[in-house]
């Protein structure tokens, strides 16, 4: 069965990740740097943006030019936090789903972001393939990934304090379901899916605990913003941002009814039948729940 073949998923259900990692975890510097990078790479606006691995909506307000945003995350807990932060409106659609088995019709979105999410993907090429299917030709894709070939890992490897090589192309799993990737491998996977890389930014140049303790985060982020453009020459920071465009042209129309956004993630059938608080597949008869404003495609309703 399809469920048995899917790669494992990093599930933040019930986690205090947003408060522990971001709000009280000493990462204001990283958050500011990522905000600067997103502002530089985002298109001026659009109709429908897919935020993959949206979590608690930390970055969602950084996409003001888009008329509607779909927040996708595997964790319903994280989406509830995003809903509390952003509210319920026609601007935001909350979807609990597996990136490897997305519930969207092909060619729906004119933009997508994947920030601090690919590093949880056991099968990154499969995840990028799903992104490509969801996008319209000519759509913008902003991808952040954890860089295997960063200065710290290169130094540790040279000193014999690290077994894995930062120079080989295969991903390294430094802890369960946490992966670093080689820049050349990422570029090749994007090319194979028909993406054209337009800009590369290096981010978090000063991710050093001592510096973050003694230098104000705003000042550090300002320095980082000056250096981000060096990504066009080489990528040696722990975090890399890419702006890519899917080959082709065309701006497809976006359905007014969000029910038309979805296909059955099990068999691919669309449209789904709206049953109020559930969506039903007319082909395989699976039922997907809608509860508290969150569409849940993680598993069939019992």
Task: Label every PLM stretch briefly.
Residues 164-185:
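Acceptor-substrate binding/catalytic loop of class I
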Residues 113:
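A conserved beta-strand element that flanks and buttresses the S-adenosyl-L-methionine
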Residues 125-140:
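A short glycine-rich, Lys/Arg-flanked "PGG" loop and its adjoining helix->strand segment in the class I
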Residues 160-163, 188, 199-270, 275:
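A C-terminal cap/extension of S-adenosyl-L-methionine-dependent methyltransferases
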Residues 1-55, 78, 142-165, 298-302:
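Conserved class I S-adenosyl-L-methionine
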Residues 54-101:
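Class I SAM-dependent methyltransferase SAM/SAH-binding core
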